[in-house]
């Protein structure tokens, strides 16, 4: 559906995209994640040639957009919609007229416009807001209008540029659920860029990780846990791992004591078995659970524990071996000072 081949883009001599190669399947929800400045937005804008790549090909539905005339490119863009962090609504126009705008620009007759809007308003749950103005809407409602406007010309691709980053958590959940519903209802290919792993894990089937203008990893979410060195997996663990409180970190030493502080990452079946209690009995050691969290990721249960052990170096080594045999990732964070927490 979308194929990017050898894309390069630079600004003032600095590479923003460096040899991007990517294939996105028709009908999937695909995430691109990375820190600010990684090149995510530039990549997204190259897909519809809002930013023209310096090199490479952008092939959508079998058509290379880089080789099209200006007129043909404008026609091809009719099937590529986009929503942004900021809603870009016309404040002087009603919800109806904001949604109608792209269709009127394309010369669609008013009766067809009315029918399309009547179809879309229930989908975005704004049936009672047809005659409202943007100033009368919440942030989430404004984004719903922007989504309906993007869908008005029946696109095959929807590009989402940090579409939830300006919203509160509850509204973000609602918008992500709406995007998932749209994907299932219309079969639209959705490309979503974000810096938040939580957004990706909610609705994406596959993702790419971008670092300094390069795609360093592309994977199905269901495969993340099979790749110990996966950067996406590390980003997931960082998201679900509770932050150590100051009262704990200030009691840590970087030299060995018999109170190692260990972080454990579980996934799949390992997250549902009584590993801690079994290991405590079998190794005859005290295991004090200090912090814990559990989550679901593409149908896989994953969790993190921070535990304080009572263990000499040999016992700590035995504990780590047991964890690794069980498929549990272990990280020694430090050692608790002898006088305790």
UniProtKB/Swiss-Prot annotation:
Please give the chief subcellular localization of this protein: membrane
Catalyses which reaction(s): L-methionine(out) + ATP + H2O = L-methionine(in) + ADP + phosphate + H(+); D-methionine(out) + ATP + H2O = D-methionine(in) + ADP + phosphate + H(+)
- Which InterPro entries does the UniProt record give? AAA+_ATPase, ABC_transporter-like_ATP-bd, ABC_transporter-like_CS, ACT-like_dom_sf, MetN_ABC, MetN_ABC_transporter-like, NIL_domain, P-loop_NTPase
ABC transporter domain mapped to chain residues:
2-237
What EC number(s) would the UniProt record show?
7.4.2.11
The answer to keyword Translocase applying to this record is yes
**Which SUPFAM superfamilies is this protein grouped with?**
ACT-like, P-loop containing nucleoside triphosphate hydrolases
UniProt keyword annotation of DNA repair present = no
Give the UniProt subcellular location, in the record's own words: Cell inner membrane
Q: Which GO terms describe its molecular function?
A: ABC-type D-methionine transporter activity; ATP binding; ATP hydrolysis activity
Q: Tell me which family the UniProt entry assigns to this protein.
A: Belongs to the ABC transporter superfamily. Methionine importer (TC 3.A.1.24) family.
Q: What is this protein called?
A: Methionine import ATP-binding protein MetN
Top-level taxonomy: Bacteria, Pseudomonadati, Pseudomonadota, Gammaproteobacteria, Legionellales
């Amino acid at each position: 559906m979308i194929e990017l081949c050898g894309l390069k883009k630079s600004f003032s001599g600095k590479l923003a995209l460096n040899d991007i190669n990517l294939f996105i399947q028709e009908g999937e929800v695909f995430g691109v994640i990375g820190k600010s400045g990684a090149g995510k937005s530039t990549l997204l804008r190259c897909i519809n040639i809002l930013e023209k790549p310096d090199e490479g090909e952008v092939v959508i539905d079998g058509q290379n957009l880089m080789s099209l005339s200006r007129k043909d490119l404008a026609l091809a863009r009719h099937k590529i919609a986009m929503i942004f962090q900021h809603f870009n609504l016309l404040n002087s126009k009603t919800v109806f007229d904001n949604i109608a705008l792209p269709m009127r620009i394309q010369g669609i007759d008013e009766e067809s416009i009315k029918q399309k809007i009547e179809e879309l308003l229930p989908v975005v749950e704004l049936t009672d807001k047809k005659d409202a103005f943007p100033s009368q809407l919440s942030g989430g409602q404004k984004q719903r209008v922007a989504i309906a406007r993007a869908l008005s010309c029946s696109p095959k691709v929807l590009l989402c540029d940090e579409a939830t980053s300006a919203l509160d958590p509850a509204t973000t959940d609602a918008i992500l659920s709406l995007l998932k519903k749209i994907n299932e209802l219309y079969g639209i290919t959705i490309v979503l860029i974000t810096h938040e792993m939580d957004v990706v894990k909610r609705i994406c089937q596959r993702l790419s990780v971008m670092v300094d203008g390069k795609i360093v990893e592309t994977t199905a979410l269901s495969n993340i846990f099979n790749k110990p060195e996966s950067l996406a997996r590390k980003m997931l663990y960082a998201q679900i791992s509770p932050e150590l409180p100051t009262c704990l970190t200030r009691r840590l030493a970087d030299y060995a004591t018999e109170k190692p502080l260990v972080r454990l990452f579980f996934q799949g079946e390992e997250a549902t078995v009584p590993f801690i209690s079994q290991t405590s009995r079998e190794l005859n050691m005290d295991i004090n659970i200090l912090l814990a969290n559990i989550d679901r990721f593409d149908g896989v249960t994953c969790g993190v524990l921070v535990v304080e052990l009572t263990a000499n170096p040999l016992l700590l080594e035995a504990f780590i071996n047991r964890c690794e045999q069980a498929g549990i990732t272990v990280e020694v964070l430090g050692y608790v000072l002898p006088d305790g927490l």
